[in-house]
Amino acid sequence: MTFNITSMDEDVLLTERESSFRVLTGCFLSVLILSTLLGNTLVCAAVIRFRHLRSKVTNFFVISLAVSDLLVAVLVMPWKAVAEIAGFWPFGTFCNIWVAFDIMCSTASILNLCVISVDRYWAISSPFRYERKMTPKVAFIMIGVAWTLSVLISFIPVQLNWHKAKTTSFFDLNITLHDRTMDNCDSSLNRTYAISSSLISFYIPVAIMIVTYTRIYRIAAKQIRRISALERAAVHAKNCQNSTSNRNSLDCQQPESSLKTSFKRETKVLKTLSVIMGVFVCCWLPFFILNCIVPFCDPSLTTSGTEPFCISSTTFDVFVWFGWANSSLNPIIYAFNADFRKAFSNLLGCYRLCPTSNNIIETVSINNNGAVVYSCQQEPKGSIPNECNLVYLIPHAIICPEDEVLKKEDESGLSKSLEKMSPAFSGILDYDADVSLEKINPITQNGQPKT
């Protein structure tokens, strides 16, 4: 009798612990879903509301990414969250459609990240050709290819049952071994589909992203050194001119501050690109490794413990949520540059409460003789540019002299901000809270802006 009472107490305690764990899981997943919805909805609303954001072709890719992540938060995450809390799949035959949505939306998100990396590499490596060739039509074709691939590897195989393994799945056996008689929507993939879909959805895109961002860093670092050399030469010439007039040869020396600035800029670029790739890889790599390994598990050997790669369905689900969490981080990484931050502040009605610092805008003009003329001005807080035909500066243009930038920042009390190099960096290289926007304006032969 005492044994029965003790057993009942243990069962009640386990039930309470399981209920508490499910409540905590539900709260965490709800926060994740809401943050994904809010971030990506803000991105879409900002582009719809402000015309200057729609005028930049590179933002088309950001919008496509936001839409795919928004679909993850609407069509994929809530249904799985309910199943996690309930402990079983309560939606019956909707499982196959949900699996197709899961594969399609996740693949679309990853392929859009890949397209963004290609777009920004093209803008950095061939800026003049990019300005001519990257039209809205080309952008829509690239986006269309990404979404078409996502649909082809999701709905067609799933609806035709090409994706399922013919043998008893490891996860199904795992549920049976634990005496759990519940509806289950953990679809077991066959080996061919698991490997081929993983290649298209992750491994090929991540390889492309690694190559493009590595080359972007090399080009950016090289250009930063060129600009630093021009700055040092200009300051050196100015010092020598002043020392000649003052007859003081000690003032005519190479400045060291520009070298430090160049190193800091390169480090900042490297950190930013590392964050982009690091977040993406950390979120998705564990899942896709398991996605390729699990189909090779032999269910008949799981009881003997001789299968080292077979894992529980709970562990697999944790890494699935890690991948989906990437959709909540993408708006922060790709759409939190100065333009989008100001748009978000205006949409939320907090442009007076949310401090947005003044931006030093470097306007670079090229006259008919090929000479580069530049000027600097500050943009007031909370303002949204009215121009719709902004053309971002290529990385070969000359920026404002360092001492002039520092002088303006001393007057406004702002910290030092680094310059964006091209449209490829418009969404990712937001160096500090204050960023500089660059554009090319055609000017007349005498050096005056064309009206």
Swiss-Prot record:
Membrane-topology descriptor: Multi-pass membrane protein
Keyword annotations: Cell membrane, Cell projection, Disulfide bond, G-protein coupled receptor, Glycoprotein, Lipoprotein, Membrane, Palmitate, Receptor, Transducer, Transmembrane, Transmembrane helix
Glycosylation sites: 4
GO molecular function: dopamine neurotransmitter receptor activity, coupled via Gs; G protein-coupled receptor activity
Extracellular-facing ranges: 1-22, 87-95, 163-191, 299-315
Disulfide-linked positions: 95-185
Cytoplasmic side: 49-59, 119-137, 218-271, 341-451
Record's function text: Dopamine receptor whose activity is mediated by G proteins which activate adenylyl cyclase.
Descriptive protein name: D(1A) dopamine receptor
